[in-house]
C-alpha cells in the first residue's frame, strides 16, 4: 500500500467524530467512535512494521526518536498542519512498533459546555487545597480539568502552572498567567516539577497524573502550603481514591496522611463516559464528594467506609453518587438502562434511585417501594 500521510488521516477521522486512532502490525488502522473500536479496513489495508515506522517518523523529532529507540514507550504531543493537537503514545508489542493517538479539542470546553455540576466551579475557585478528578483511561478526566482551569483563567487573577505528559489543552493568558510544562521537554518528571513549582510563585498547580508516591507526596505538600492543586488518579470512586492515596504511604505514616487529607482535600470527582441513547456521542457521569467537616472527620478517623452513604445523603452540599446520576440520566432517557447497569456500583441502589426519579426499569428487577 502507499504511505499513509498522517496529517490527512488524522483530519479524516476527526471529521468522523472519532476520539482515538491506532496503528499496529497486521491490521488496518483502527478508530474509537463513541467508545467502540472499529477498523478502517474499507479505506485502508493492513499495516506493516515499515509503514508504522514511517508514520512515527512523520510525527517525531530527533529527540523523540531517540527516546523511542531507548525506551520503546514514549508520550508526546503532535499538531497537524490544520492546527489540531493530539496526544500520542508510541509503544512496542511483539517487538514491533504500535501507535495510539488521542484526538484533542482545540477549543477548551467550558464547564457549562460540558454540562458539569456548578460545584466544580466552586472547587476551581478555592484558594487552596487538593481537587482530584478520577476515573479509568479515556473517561474525560483531562477535559474536565481543562474546563476547571479555564474557569479559573476567566474568573480569577492567578498564576497557574500545569505539569503534563504531554500538554493536551493549550491555555491562553486571560485573567491568569498560565505556564504549561511538558514532561520530557521542560522538566524530567512530575515530582521534580511539583517541587520546583513551589519556587515559581504559583496560585494554582495542575498535575496531569499522580503516578507514584513522590508525586502524591509533593502534591499534598503543595496543597498544604497554600496552593490549589488539581490532579488525576485512575480510581473509580471517592472512597477508593482516598484509600489509594493512604495505601501508598508506609504504615507508620498513614495516620499523618489521613490528617493531611482531612485538612486539605477539597473534593473528588470520579467520572465515567456513557454512550447517549440517541447515538450522538457520550456523556460524563460523575460521583462527586465535597469534603465537608463531617467527611473530614471520617477521613481523619479512618472511617472511609462511611463516605459512600454520606455522598448519597449529601445533595444539599453538592454531592451525588454515581448510581444516583446513572439513575437520573436513565430516567431522563439520556442513557440506556443496559449501559447504566454496566457502570453502576450497586445494582440494587441504582434501581432504587431509578424508582425515586420516576424511571421504569426494563430489566425485570423487582423494586421495593418500602
Listing of model-derived features with the role each one plays in the protein:
Residues 1-370:
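Short, flexible helix-loop junctions that flank or precede catalytic/ligand sites
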Amino acid at each position: 500500500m502507499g504511505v499513509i500521510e498522517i496529517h490527512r488521516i488524522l483530519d479524516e477521522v476527526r471529521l468522523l467524530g472519532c476520539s482515538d486512532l491506532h496503528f499496529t502490525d497486521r491490521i488496518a488502522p483502527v478508530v474509537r467512535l463513541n467508545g467502540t473500536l472499529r477498523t478502517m479496513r474499507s479505506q485502508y489495508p493492513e499495516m506493516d512494521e515499515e509503514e508504522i515506522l514511517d508514520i512515527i517518523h512523520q510525527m517525531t523529532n530527533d529527540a523523540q526518536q531517540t527516546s523511542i529507540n531507548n525506551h520503546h514507550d514514549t508520550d508526546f504531543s503532535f499538531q497537524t498542519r490544520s492546527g489540531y493537537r493530539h496526544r500520542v503514545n508510541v509503544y512496542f508489542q511483539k517487538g514491533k512498533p504500535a501507535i495510539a493517538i488521542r484526538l484533542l479539542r482545540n477549543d477548551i470546553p467550558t464547564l457549562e459546555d460540558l454540562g458539569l455540576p456548578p460545584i466544580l466551579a466552586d472547587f476551581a475557585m478555592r484558594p487552596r487545597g487538593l481537587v482530584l478528578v478520577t476515573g479509568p483511561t479515556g473517561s474525560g478526566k483531562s477535559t474536565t480539568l481543562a474546563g476547571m482551569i479555564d474557569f479559573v483563567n476567566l474568573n480569577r487573577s492567578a498564576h497557574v502552572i500545569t505539569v503534563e505528559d504531554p500538554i493536551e489543552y493549550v491555555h491562553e493568558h486571560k485573567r491568569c498567567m498560565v505556564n504549561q510544562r511538558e514532561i520530557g521537554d521542560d522538566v524530567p518528571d512530575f515530582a521534580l516539577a511539583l517541587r520546583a513549582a513551589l519556587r515559581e510563585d504559583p496560585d494554582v498547580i495542575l498535575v496531569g497524573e499522580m503516578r507514584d508516591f513522590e508525586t502524591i507526596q509533593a502534591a499534598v505538600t503543595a496543597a498544604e502550603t497554600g496552593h490549589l492543586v488539581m490532579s488525576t488518579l485512575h480510581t473509580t470512586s471517592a472512597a477508593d481514591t482516598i484509600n489509594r492515596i493512604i495505601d501508598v504511604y508506609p504504615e507508620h505514616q498513614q495516620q499523618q496522611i489521613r490528617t493531611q487529607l482531612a485538612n486539605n482535600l477539597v473534593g473528588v470527582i470520579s467520572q465515567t463516559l456513557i454512550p447517549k441513547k440517541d447515538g450522538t456521542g457520550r456523556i460524563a457521569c460523575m460521583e462527586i464528594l465535597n469534603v465537608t467537616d463531617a467527611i473530614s472527620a471520617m477521613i481523619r478517623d479512618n472511617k472511609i467506609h462511611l463516605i459512600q452513604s454520606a455522598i448519597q445523603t449529601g445533595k444539599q452540599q453538592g454531592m451525588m453518587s454515581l448510581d444516583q446520576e446513572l439513575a437520573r440520566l436513565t430516567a431522563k432517557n439520556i442513557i440506556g438502562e443496559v449501559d447504566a447497569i454496566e457502570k453502576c456500583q450497586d445494582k440494587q441502589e441504582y434501581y432504587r434511585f431509578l424508582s425515586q426519579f420516576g424511571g421504569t426499569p426494563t430489566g425485570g428487577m423487582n423494586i421495593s417501594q418500602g
